[in-house]
């Protein structure tokens, strides 16, 4: 059993190299974002005192389900800034989705909507509680935005859902956004 601090550090590093900088660990992602688990294990072992079993434990126990491990290959489920194709299928969203963010972002969002920035998609939550958890990672006061996903979808916007249940969209135009009740 590895210590929580090391587990968190290794998990964050895995997210970093599998989503943003595979070359930092000497890895090369394929077009779908996959890399050999053996290669990742070797890269992690050169940086941390961590076993194969502990890496698998990190993947399986990650509360955010950030990774998929299959057929001795691993990838991050979403949040990439490197050019990959997650081969996501379009899905019909629930009537409402939510986005947690910092209050300081509201003025820009109110003018321009939600943008994917350096990522492939805007990340949305299926419930307010999850959006609050996401917002809590941001500095300062937080707000929860409600996305009229049903209307967006009916008007031709595409939605996808990642392997770990995060809803994804190319963008969310301002006309589909409202500040959720109960937030500042």
From Swiss-Prot:
InterPro entries xrefs: Ptrans_KptA/Tpt1 (IPR002745), RNA_2'-PTrans_C (IPR042081), RNA_2'-PTrans_KptA (IPR022928), RNA_2'-PTrans_N (IPR042080)
Record EC number: 2.7.1.-
Q: Name one GO molecular function term.
A: NAD+ poly-ADP-ribosyltransferase activity
Supply one GO BP term: tRNA splicing, via endonucleolytic cleavage and ligation
Which keywords describe this protein according to UniProt? NAD, Transferase
Keyword match Isomerase? no
EC primary class: transferase
* Function in brief: Removes the 2'-phosphate from RNA via an intermediate in which the phosphate is ADP-ribosylated by NAD followed by a presumed transesterification to release the RNA and generate ADP-ribose 1''-2''-cyclic phosphate (APPR>P). May function as an ADP-ribosylase.
Family classification = Belongs to the KptA/TPT1 family.
Matching NCBIfam families:
PRK00819.1-2
Protein name (database record): Probable RNA 2'-phosphotransferase
Its lineage opens with:
Bacteria, Pseudomonadati, Pseudomonadota, Alphaproteobacteria, Hyphomicrobiales
Query: What gene is it encoded by?
Result: kptA
């Amino acid at each position: 059993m590895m210590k929580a601090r090391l587990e968190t550090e290794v998990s964050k590093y895995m997210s970093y190299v599998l989503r943003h900088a595979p070359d930092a660990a000497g890895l090369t992602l394929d077009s779908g974002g996959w890399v050999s688990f053996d290669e990742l294990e070797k890269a992690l072992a050169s940086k941390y005192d961590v076993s194969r079993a502990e890496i698998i434990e990190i993947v399986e126990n990650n509360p955010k389900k950030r990774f998929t491990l299959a057929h001795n290959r691993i990838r991050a489920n979403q949040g990439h800034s490197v050019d990959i194709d997650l081969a996501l299928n379009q899905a019909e969203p629930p009537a409402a989705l939510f986005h947690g963010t910092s209050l300081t972002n509201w003025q820009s969002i109110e003018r321009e909507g939600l943008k994917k920035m350096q990522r492939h998609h805007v990340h949305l939550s299926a419930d307010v509680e999850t959006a609050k958890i996401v917002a809590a990672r941001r500095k300062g006061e937080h707000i929860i935005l409600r996305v009229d996903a049903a209307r967006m979808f009916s008007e031709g916007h595409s939605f996808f859902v990642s392997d770990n249940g995060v809803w994804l969209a190319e963008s969310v135009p301002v006309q589909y956004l409202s500040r959720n009740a109960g937030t500042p």
